[in-house]
Amino acid sequence: MRRAAIIGFAAILASFAGFAATEYDVMIPSNTLGVVKVTSAAEYLPLAIGYGAVSAGSDAEARADGLIMTSNLVAGDELFVYDHESGKYDVFGLEKAEDGTATWKSRRVVVISNGGVTVEEGTAAADTVLAPGYGCWLHRPGVASRDDKTVTLAGQVFTGKITVTIAAASGTKAFGQTLIGPPVPSTGDFHLNGGSISWTGAVKGDEIRLAKEDGTYETVKYTGTQWIRYYYENDGGLSRLKKDTDPVIPAGQAAWYARKAGNPSFNIEMEVK
């Protein structure tokens, strides 16, 4: 079975050669089932690999065909998965039978190189292991017109710590980008300053970029000691700059870690509490 680190397909197309291969430490989930719902109108929705497979045993990471519940999805929705061992992108499409049975089917494997983009035949979703602590992209064409915009993730709750490698920038790029998807904690949202992650190795100027429904990003900046989200708020007709000293990655969602150029890759440890 291939072990796949996950990263956003659309962003990689725009920033090819800025991504370095990532590694991860596999955690063994407990026998506690977790469920989280993400409601969003975003067509490209970054989701966290926040749960393990609903099974016991030492090889209990989630698979591409098991993490995302299909009841609120429609035929034609696609899941994009980056395989760091092969450097290729697995694309899975959702198919639904007349009886309502839904199956993730391999659509294609996309290969991106300096020579352009090529497409190969894909492999089964059940054979693609999702790396805990990273993220994946769910593409839902026309989601804005759907009555139900909720995506449900389910699986076994992780315990202990998960190690994720943050990629360095390469070439002339200002940042190296890694899509991180924190394990879903019992408290819900993942607090960046709450001690759940060891930020040893992070540097002033690093950013975490949270996707918004309109396709833009909200930026959280690292000051050297903590993460702060800066935003503007209307105050008596004036737009004033505010700061949030307790920024979070919403439960079940993934976010880009943008590593400032000139700094090496490093590991972060995500602790589930």
Regions found by a protein language model. Give the residues of each.
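Bacterial N-terminal signal peptides
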Residues: 7-15
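Residues in and immediately flanking transmembrane alpha helices
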Residues: 15-16, 116
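A short, polar beta-strand/turn micro-motif
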Residues: 18-75, 85, 125-204, 251-273
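Fold-core signature of tandem repeat domains
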Residues: 79-81, 92, 138, 208-210, ...
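Intrinsically disordered, low-complexity segments enriched in Gly and acidic/Ser/Thr residues
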Residues: 182-240
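General helical structural elements
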Residues: 6-7, 112
